[in-house]
Swiss-Prot record:
Family according to the record: Belongs to the UPF0473 family.
Pfam family of the protein (one): DUF1292
Organism of provenance: Enterococcus faecalis (strain ATCC 700802 / V583)
Domain of life: Bacteria
InterPro entries xrefs: UPF0473
The protein's name: UPF0473 protein EF_1204
Disulfide bonds: none
Amino acid sequence: MTEHNHDHDHEGHEHITLVDEQGNETLYEILLTVDGQEEFGKNYVLLYPAGIPEDEDVELQAYSYVENAEGTEGDLQQIETDAEWDMIEEVFNTFMAEEEE
């Protein structure tokens, strides 16, 4: 389980700070969120390290999550099933196709 806090900058990018087991904080940008409530009973987020130039390849990270009532903190969980990964991959591919248009 990884803790996270949301932060918003003035450029319109939403950020999230991940805190690992040793207490190290790493800033990530949120690429997109996926509503999986109807199918899986949880939501998902795709992240990449903040500050990476747009033309550079990045490794995306995907998690399921549940936010607190204020929507400012919550717990990220590892994605557990192939069905969840398939749904996230489909949403990501659609997102990328729309971005290229």
